[in-house]
Every structure is written in C-alpha cells, then in structure tokens.
C-alpha cells in the first residue's frame, strides 16, 4: 500500500 492521495481512500 502506498500513501493515500486523499484521506480515507485506500490506494494499492
């Protein structure tokens, strides 16, 4: 998992 572009959005 990378850092999420926006809080609350999980971005693999």
Curated annotation (Swiss-Prot):
It comes from Cycas revoluta. Keywords: Cell wall, Secreted. The keyword Secreted applies. It comes from the Eukaryota. This is Unknown protein 2. It is found in: Secreted, Cell wall. GO terms for cellular component: extracellular region. Its main location: secreted. The lineage of its organism: Eukaryota, Viridiplantae, Streptophyta, Embryophyta, Tracheophyta.
